[in-house]
């Protein structure tokens, strides 16, 4: 059972975006917050077909509207490579954010739609 105060988080990123209806590779960034600083735990690859799904896979539970909203593949946003380096993620494999509302607010997003 996980609680809202759990130090573990899952963030979804799109690794290789395709048009709606195509399969897209998705990576879930698992990180732990220690003393206010996020520490990268690892990447877990998942695959979604048709439309991109917002948020990590989880049993149905009450969630804020911003997290339950589905996002189309062409509505994704790029993550600032400088911020990716804070997680020791390689900017050359830069990920696209699946769920803008679900990302940690401390990450700096560029307001550029990918499409």
From Swiss-Prot:
Transmembrane segments: none annotated. The lineage of its organism: Eukaryota, Metazoa, Chordata, Craniata, Vertebrata. It comes from the Eukaryota. This is Putative TGFB1-induced anti-apoptotic factor 1. GO terms for cellular component: nucleus. Keywords: Apoptosis, Nucleus. Not detectable in normal kidney and liver. Up-regulated in chronic and acute allograft rejection: expressed in the inflammatory infiltrate and in tubular epithelial cells. One of its GO terms (biological process) is negative regulation of apoptotic process.
């Amino acid at each position: 059972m996980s609680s809202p105060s759990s130090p573990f988080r899952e963030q979804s990123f799109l690794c290789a975006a395709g048009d709606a209806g195509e399969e897209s590779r998705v990576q879930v960034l698992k990180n732990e917050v220690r003393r206010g600083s996020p520490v990268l735990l690892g990447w877990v690859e998942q695959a979604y077909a048709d439309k991109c799904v917002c948020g990590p896979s989880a049993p149905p539970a009450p969630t804020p509207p911003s997290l339950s909203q589905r996002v189309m593949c062409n509505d994704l946003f790029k993550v600032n490579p400088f911020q990716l380096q804070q997680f020791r993620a390689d900017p050359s494999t830069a990920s696209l954010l699946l769920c803008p509302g679900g990302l940690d607010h401390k990450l700096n997003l560029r307001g550029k739609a990918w499409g």
